[in-house]
C-alpha cells in the first residue's frame, strides 16, 4: 500500500483539501479512494480589534502556508516523496462575514468575521424588505450596515466576498463562490437545479431580491459586487503560477491543478456527514453549534430563527445557527481536570487525561441517579451574544433554586442541556413547519465521547442522531471530496456520496428516549422563562464585557479545535 500511495503522490493522482476554521487551518490529502493519507494543520486565533472580531490577511497567508507545509512534511515523512501537483484542489472556510475590496484588489477595512453581531439595524431592514430572514452575520447585512453607518470605504467598494472566495481568488485569479458559501452572503434563487449527466447545472443569487436590496442599500449595481456562483462539480479555474507560489513559496508546487468551487464550512460539514439529500441533516457542535436540514419543500414563511442556505449542489437547507456551543462544557472539564490533576499530585495517584475527564463527567449526565430535567439546575452557555434568543450581550450562568438537586450528574446534564437548548428552540420552528427529518448526523469534538452526548442530543431535537466514521475527518476532507467530484458529475452529488464515498451505514444511531425527551422539554421550559436574566447579568457586568468569547476560552480545548474545521 505504501509503494502504491507513493506512486500516486508522484503521479499527481491525489486530491488536496484545505479548510480555514475559526481556530485551526487544516490541509488533508486523499487518495483515489478518498481515504486520507496525509494531513497538516496550523492553529490560529481571531483578534478583537476596535470592537470587531477579525483575522488579518497576513495571518491567512501565514496560516495557509504553514498548514500546507505541514502536510508536505507529513507526506515526506510517510512516503519519502514530495508532492508537486494534484488531481484536484478544494478550499473552504468559515462562512459569512465581510471582505470588501477596491478596484485594485486592496482590502478596504479589516475582515469582519461571522462572529460580529453589530449589524442589527441592517439585518432587520433587509429581512423586512425581502421577506426573507437575513441573519446578522450575512455579508449583505455587513455591507448595508456599513452604508447605514456612513463608513467612508463604501464609496470605494468594487467587490465583496467571503474568506473561501478570497483564498480561491489568490490561487486561481477567479472571483467565484460555491453556491453553499454564496448562500451565506445573499439569498439564492429557489427551485430545482437544472442539471444532467456531466452537467452540474447552475444557480445564482435571487434576482428579484437583488433588485429590492439594491434600491434599499442605494448602490448602483449590487450584483456586480458579488462573486459568480457555481454549483458542486462546476469548473472553477486552475492553480496559477502566482497561486502556487503564494501557497508554497518553496517553488515545489506546480501550477495547473483544477479547483472546485470554494465552499463554506457548512457545506463541507454536509458532505462529511453524507447529509445533502432531502430529509437528512447534520449537527455540528464546537465553540458554536448549528443544525442543517435539507428541505423537500420551501418554508411557508420567513423565520428569524432559521437561515435558509443551500447544499453545495444548490438544494435549499434550513439552518439553525447558535453562536454558543460546547465551550462551557469544555470549561467545566478543565476545572474537573485540574481537580483530578491536583488530587493526583497530592496522593501520588496516576493522573488522567482530558478524554477520561470527559468520559467520566458525561457518564454522570446519564447515570441512574441523575434527573432527566437536571434536577432544577439551569445553565446558559452564552459566552457571546445569541441572536436566536435575542440576547445581544451574553453571560455564561449557572442557576439553581434552593430546592434543586445539586449533584455532579445534574450539573453535567444541565450543561449539556444548556448547550443544546438554543438549538432546540430553533428546531422547534422546523417542527412547526412540518419539516420531515429521517435522521441527523452529529459531528464535533464532543462526540469523541460515545454515548451520552448523542443520546441527549436525540432527546433535545426529537430525531434519531447518527454518528459516521467520516464525520470526524472534518471540512478539509469534505472539500477534498468536492474536489474529487469534479470527475464524477455523471452522478448527482447525493448519489455520489451515498454510493461511492460512503456506501456503509452509520456507526451507531441513537433514538430519542421518552424519559429523556420529557426531561429536556421540562428543562427547556425553565430555560425560556429564565432568559430575561441574561439582560440583567449583562447590565451588571458590562464595563468588562466583550461581544464574543475570549481567546483563552475559544481555543483552549483541542476537542473543540478538532470540530472547528467544520464550524
Regions found by a protein language model. Name each.
Residues 99-103, 171-175, 181-182, 189-192, ...:
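Short acidic, glycine/serine/threonine-rich loops at helix termini
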Residues 262-302, 306-310:
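Acidic, glycine-rich loop-and-beta core segments that form the ion-binding/anion-interacting portion
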Residues 66-86, 150-154, 211-222, 247-250, ...:
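Phosphate/pyrophosphate-binding loops at sites that engage ATP/ADP/AMP, CoA/4′-phosphopantetheine
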Residues 40-81, 131:
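N-terminal phosphate-binding loop and adjacent alpha-helix
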Residues 2-11, 77-80, 142-149, 241-251, ...:
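Conserved phosphate-binding catalytic cores of ATP/NTP-utilizing and phosphoryl-transfer enzymes
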Residues 1-41, 48, 84-124, 233, ...:
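Glycine/Thr-rich phosphate-binding loops that ligate phosphate moieties of nucleotide
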Residues 34, 55, 59, 87-94, ...:
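Active-site nucleophile and cofactor-binding loops and adjacent substrate-binding regions
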Residues 20-22, 133-263, 412, 416-417:
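Gly/Ser/Thr-rich active-site cleft segment
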Amino acid at each position: 500500500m505504501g509503494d502504491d500511495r507513493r506512486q500516486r503522490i508522484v503521479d499527481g493522482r491525489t486530491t488536496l483539501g484545505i479548510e480555514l476554521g475559526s481556530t485551526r487551518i487544516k490541509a488533508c490529502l486523499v487518495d483515489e479512494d478518498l481515504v486520507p493519507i496525509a494531513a497538516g494543520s496550523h492553529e490560529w486565533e481571531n483578534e478583537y480589534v476596535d470592537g470587531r472580531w477579525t483575522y488579518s490577511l497576513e495571518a491567512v497567508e501565514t496560516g495557509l502556508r504553514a498548514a500546507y507545509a505541514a502536510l508536505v512534511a507529513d507526506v515526506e515523512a510517510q512516503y519519502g516523496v514530495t508532492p508537486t501537483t494534484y488531481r484536484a484542489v478544494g478550499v473552504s472556510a468559515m462562512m459569512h462575514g465581510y471582505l470588501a475590496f477596491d478596484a485594485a484588489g486592496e482590502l478596504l477595512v479589516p475582515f469582519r468575521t461571522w462572529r460580529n453581531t453589530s449589524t442589527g439595524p441592517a439585518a432587520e431592514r433587509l429581512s423586512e424588505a425581502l421577506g426573507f430572514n437575513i441573519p446578522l452575520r450575512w455579508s449583505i447585512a455587513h455591507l448595508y450596515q456599513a452604508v447605514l453607518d456612513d463608513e467612508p470605504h463604501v464609496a470605494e467598494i468594487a467587490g465583496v466576498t467571503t474568506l473561501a472566495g478570497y483564498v480561491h481568488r489568490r490561487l486561481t485569479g477567479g472571483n467565484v463562490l460555491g453556491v453553499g458559501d454564496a448562500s451565506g452572503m445573499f439569498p439564492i434563487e429557489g427551485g430545482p437545479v437544472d442539471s444532467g449527466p456531466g452537467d452540474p447545472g447552475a444557480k445564482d443569487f435571487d434576482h428579484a431580491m437583488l433588485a429590492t436590496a439594491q434600491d434599499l442599500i442605494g448602490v448602483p449595481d449590487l450584483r456586480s459586487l458579488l462573486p459568480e456562483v457555481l454549483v458542486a462539480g462546476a469548473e472553477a479555474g486552475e492553480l496559477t503560477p502566482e497561486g502556487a507560489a503564494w501557497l508554497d513559496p518553496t517553488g515545489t508546487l506546480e501550477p495547473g491543478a483544477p479547483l472546485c468551487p470554494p465552499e463554506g464550512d457548512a457545506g463541507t460539514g454536509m458532505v462529511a456527514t453524507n447529509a445533502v439529500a432531502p430529509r437528512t441533516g447534520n449537527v455540528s457542535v464546537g465553540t458554536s453549534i448549528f443544525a442543517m436540514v435539507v428541505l423537500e419543500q420551501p418554508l411557508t414563511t420567513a423565520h428569524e430563527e432559521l437561515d435558509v442556505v443551500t447544499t453545495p449542489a444548490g438544494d435549499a437547507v434550513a439552518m439553525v445557527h447558535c453562536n454558543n456551543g460546547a465551550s462551557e462544557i469544555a470549561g467545566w472539564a478543565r476545572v474537573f481536570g485540574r481537580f483530578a490533576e491536583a488530587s493526583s499530585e497530592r496522593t501520588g495517584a496516576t493522573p488522567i487525561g482530558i478524554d477520561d475527564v470527559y468520559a467520566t463527567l458525561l457518564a454522570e449526565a446519564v447515570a441512574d441517579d441523575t434527573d432527566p430535567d437536571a434536577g432544577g439546575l439551569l445553565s446558559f452557555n452564552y459566552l457571546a451574544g445569541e441572536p436566536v434568543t435575542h440576547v445581544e450581550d451574553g453571560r455564561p450562568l449557572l442557576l439553581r433554586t434552593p430546592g434543586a438537586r445539586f449533584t455532579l450528574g445534574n450539573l453535567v446534564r444541565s450543561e449539556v442541556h444548556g448547550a443544546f437548548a438554543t438549538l432546540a428552540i430553533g428546531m422547534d420552528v422546523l417542527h412547526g413547519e412540518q419539516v420531515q427529518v429521517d435522521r441527523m448526523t452529529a459531528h464535533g469534538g464532543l462526540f469523541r465521547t460515545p454515548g451520552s452526548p448523542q443520546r441527549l442530543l436525540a432527546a433535545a431535537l426529537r430525531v434519531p442522531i447518527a454518528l459516521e466514521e467520516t464525520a470526524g475527518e472534518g471540512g478539509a476532507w469534505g472539500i477534498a471530496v468536492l474536489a474529487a467530484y469534479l470527475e464524477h458529475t455523471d452522478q448527482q452529488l447525493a448519489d455520489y456520496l451515498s454510493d461511492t464515498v460512503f456506501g456503509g451505514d452509520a456507526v451507531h444511531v441513537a433514538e430519542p428516549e421518552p424519559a429523556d425527551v420529557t426531561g429536556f422539554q421540562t428543562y427547556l421550559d425553565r430555560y425560556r422563562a429564565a432568559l430575561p436574566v441574561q439582560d440583567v447579568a449583562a447590565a451588571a457586568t458590562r464595563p468588562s464585557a466583550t461581544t464574543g468569547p475570549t481567546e483563552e476560552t475559544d481555543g483552549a480545548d483541542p476537542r473543540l479545535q478538532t470540530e472547528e474545521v467544520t464550524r
